[in-house]
């Protein structure tokens, strides 16, 4: 074991760093896409149910099958891996964002409206901070997914 590490230690470290790079890029892209879409979807329950169902179906596809589909489109390399991981980590963030914003007490929203807040101010100053624990829970779950796949 020590001999193997001595011979291939540099390559092991570079591949580990490459894995972290791919994982972080996929996770950041998923956060950038899923949180705003989740906020928009939280306003319409019917559309949210349709989109979350489609995202859930996409997540049931095995990773190797997604990679097999991505390689002819994007070629071999980091790009198909990032796209495949992005698809897999999108759902927990999207789902938790929608649930976090939808489950805010209507009395709290009403209090913000009665103070004269615009829809944007209400989202920025009231809804988003209250939904943040659930959103961060989705990001945490997705970070575990992205590292393990």
PLM segments and residue spans:
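Generic alpha-helical transmembrane segments of integral inner-membrane proteins
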Residues: 24, 28-36, 40, 86
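Residue positions within transmembrane alpha-helices of multi-pass solute transporters
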Residues: 24, 32-33, 61, 65, ...
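Transmembrane alpha-helices
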Residues: 87, 120-149
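Loop-to-helix entry region at the N-terminal start of transmembrane alpha-helices
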Residues: 15-22, 71-92
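Periplasmic/extracellular loop-to-transmembrane helix junction in inner-membrane transport proteins
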Residues: 1-26
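Hydrophobic alpha-helical elements at and bordering transmembrane segments
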Residues: 12, 16, 20, 54-57, ...
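Intracellular coupling helices
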Residues: 102-113, 120-125
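Cytoplasmic-entry segments and transmembrane alpha-helices of multi-pass inner-membrane transporters
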Residues: 37-69, 85, 95-99, 110
């Amino acid at each position: 074991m020590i001999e193997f590490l001595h011979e291939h230690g540099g390559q092991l470290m570079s591949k580990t760093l490459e894995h972290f790079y791919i994982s972080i890029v996929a996770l950041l892209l998923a956060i950038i896409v899923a949180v705003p879409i989740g906020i928009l979807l939280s306003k319409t329950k019917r559309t949210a149910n349709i989109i979350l169902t489609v995202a859930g179906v996409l997540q049931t596809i095995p990773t190797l099958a997604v990679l097999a589909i991505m390689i002819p489109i994007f070629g071999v390399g980091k790009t198909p891996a990032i796209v495949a991981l992005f698809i897999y980590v999108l759902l927990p963030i999207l789902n938790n964002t929608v649930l976090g914003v939808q489950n805010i007490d209507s009395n709290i929203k009403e209090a913000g409206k009665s103070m004269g807040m615009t829809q944007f101010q209400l989202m920025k100053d009231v809804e988003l901070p209250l939904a943040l624990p659930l959103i961060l829970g989705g990001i945490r779950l997705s970070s575990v997914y992205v590292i393990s796949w």
